[in-house]
Design a protein with these regions (language model features):
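Short, extreme N-terminal segment that most often corresponds to the first beta-strand
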Residues: 1-21
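Short, flexible N-terminal segments of the mature chain
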Residues: 14-41
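Acidic, low-complexity intrinsically disordered segments
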Residues: 34-87
């Protein structure tokens, strides 16, 4: 089971936050689906994700996206995904 804490940050403060849960084990191949589900729940655009985002999540249990990672305009400074199985 995976649990991902997703949050949008504005001026170093959490604006929106959810815990995303999925019964399957984490796989990098499914990262896009997790990202789409999380963004739909937060009602934000889906960012363009690169290999570096997946690699950072796998190696450090977190990753983040900034304005340049989005095609659409956003109303936050940073979008953070963090492993939440310990929460």
């Amino acid at each position: 089971m995976i649990r991902i804490w997703a949050k949008t940050i504005v001026e170093e403060k959490v604006q929106k936050s959810i815990i995303y849960e999925n019964s399957e084990n984490f796989t990098p191949e499914n990262f896009q689906q997790y990202l789409e589900d999380i963004c739909a729940k937060l009602d934000i655009p889906v960012p363009v994700y690169l290999t570096k985002h997946i690699r950072h999540y796998v190696n450090f249990n977190n990753t983040f996206f900034v304005e340049s990672d989005f095609v659409e305009s956003i109303d936050f400074d940073k979008f953070v995904l963090e492993e939440a199985s310990n929460y």
